[in-house]
């Protein structure tokens, strides 16, 4: 990735260290800078301390950010890494003149794309995550998905399951709620979820309301050791968090999934983002960009 020109530094200014400070800067939400910057940094064995600075839209704000970057460099002797996306030239130039190692994450891709498309870019601040007449319908659909998911979290309601696009099943604390919310917020997916609790284990059955939507069911499971560790943080030294109880619940629920031929995924070693993406792929759900 090509980097923007920052202030000139001598060879003595380059310090090899795996501990680096990172700035994510934008004239919008800074989500794009965070996502792309994190994706690049994940390729390196570095320990980062990050600061996100959204809505750097004017000269005064840019000067304050530049001073912050320079002060950190003077204090640590190590150049901060700066991932930025700023449309206004005079604001952008101030950041570029800082003592950070500057990466204009969008511009690095714009030039080759301009050549391929045969078009000149027309940058507009807030276009990526902003709201206007062109995407209002998509925004409303995403909010509706979030509302639906919250109303059908943790088995709160089994009504309206015909409107669900996926129904997640699993024991308590296996990742159903965060995955459901991520599906709704990131992809506009209406996701319900239903927990199997300790009291269900003596006679574990699939509720009729769920059997009626067999094609929408997807199970999450988890290693008992990981489940016990998570539960210990919430309810230390209880039956709920014991290894014996965790093994029992996971075993019973996995058997239920197999009996009813419900597709399922072990969430132990996956992030919420990875779990959600795998569910979309396995269930054949269309992912939407917002």
Curated annotation (Swiss-Prot):
What is the E.C. number?
2.7.11.33, 2.7.4.28
Q: Which InterPro entries match?
A: Kinase-pyrophosphorylase (IPR005177), PSRP (IPR026530)
Q: Which UniProt keywords apply?
A: Kinase, Nucleotide-binding, Serine/threonine-protein kinase, Transferase
- Any one Gene Ontology molecular-function term assigned to this protein's record: ADP binding
Pfam families for the chain? Kinase-PPPase
User: Catalyses which reaction?
Assistant: [pyruvate, water dikinase] + ADP = [pyruvate, water dikinase]-phosphate + AMP + H(+); [pyruvate, water dikinase]-phosphate + phosphate + H(+) = [pyruvate, water dikinase] + diphosphate
TM regions (residue ranges) = none
What are the binding positions for ADP in this chain? 170-177
Q: Member of which family?
A: Belongs to the pyruvate, phosphate/water dikinase regulatory protein family. PSRP subfamily.
Give the protein's biological function.
Bifunctional serine/threonine kinase and phosphorylase involved in the regulation of the phosphoenolpyruvate synthase (PEPS) by catalyzing its phosphorylation/dephosphorylation.
- Identification of the protein by name: Putative phosphoenolpyruvate synthase regulatory protein
């Amino acid at each position: 990735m090509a980097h923007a020109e920052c202030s000139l530094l001598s060879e003595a200014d380059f310090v090899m260290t795996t501990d680096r400070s990172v700035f994510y800067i934008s004239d919008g939400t800074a989500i794009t800078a965070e996502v792309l910057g994190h994706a690049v940094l994940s390729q390196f064995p570095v320990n980062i301390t990050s600061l996100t600075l959204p809505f750097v839209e004017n000269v005064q704000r840019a000067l304050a950010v530049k001073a912050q970057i320079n002060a950190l460099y003077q204090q640590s002797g190590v150049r901060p890494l700066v991932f930025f996306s700023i449309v206004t030239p005079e604001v952008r130039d101030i950041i570029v003149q800082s003592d950070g190692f500057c990466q204009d994450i969008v511009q690095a891709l714009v030039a080759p794309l301009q050549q391929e498309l045969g078009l000149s870019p027309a940058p507009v601040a807030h276009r990526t995550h902003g709201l206007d007449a062109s995407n209002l319908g998509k925004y409303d659909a995403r909010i509706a998905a979030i509302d639906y998911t919250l109303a059908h979290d943790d088995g709160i309601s089994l009504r309206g399951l015909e409107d669900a696009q996926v129904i997640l099943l699993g024991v308590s604390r296996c990742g159903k709620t965060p995955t459901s919310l991520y599906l709704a917020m990131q992809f506009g997916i209406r996701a319900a979820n239903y927990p199997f609790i300790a009291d269900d284990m003596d006679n574990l059955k699939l509720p009729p309301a769920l059997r009626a939507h067999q094609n929408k069911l997807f199970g999450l499971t988890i290693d008992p050791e990981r489940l016990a560790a998570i539960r210990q943080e919430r309810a230390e030294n209880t039956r709920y968090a014991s290894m014996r109880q965790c093994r029992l619940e996971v075993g019973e629920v996995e058997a239920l999934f197999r009996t009813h031929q419900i597709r399922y995924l072990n969430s132990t070693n996956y992030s919420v983002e990875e779990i959600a993406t795998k569910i979309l792929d396995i269930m054949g759900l269309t992912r939407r960009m917002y």
